[in-house]
């Protein structure tokens, strides 16, 4: 069974954690931006039906 030889330093752990958090942050920004463009009707890369009431 594979076992790590040395303990991961606190700074390395922090760096990895912030990268992991930033990844999620940018994903939410992209999703919000896409939702906004669909809602306003400015989306050119996403096709959706427009309902008229």
Swiss-Prot record:
Coiled-coil parts of chain: none
Protein name (Swiss-Prot/TrEMBL): Large ribosomal subunit protein bL32c
Superkingdom: Eukaryota
GO cellular-component term (any): large ribosomal subunit
Plastid among keywords: yes
GO MF assignments: structural constituent of ribosome
Keywords carried by this UniProt record: Chloroplast, Plastid, Ribonucleoprotein, Ribosomal protein
Keyword Plastid among UniProt keywords: yes
PANTHER family: 50S RIBOSOMAL PROTEIN L32, CHLOROPLASTIC (PTHR36083), LARGE RIBOSOMAL SUBUNIT PROTEIN BL32C (PTHR36083:SF1)
Predominant location: plastid
Pfam family for this entry, one: Ribosomal_L32p
Family: Belongs to the bacterial ribosomal protein bL32 family.
InterPro entries documented for this protein: Ribosomal_bL32, Ribosomal_bL32_plant/cyanobact, Ribosomal_zn-bd
Localization annotation: Plastid, Chloroplast
One GO biological process term: translation
């Amino acid at each position: 069974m594979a076992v790590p030889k040395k303990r991961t330093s606190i700074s390395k752990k922090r760096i990895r954690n912030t990268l992991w958090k930033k990844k999620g942050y940018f994903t939410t920004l992209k999703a919000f931006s896409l939702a906004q463009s669909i809602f306003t009707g400015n989306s050119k890369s996403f096709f959706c039906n427009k309902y008229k009431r």
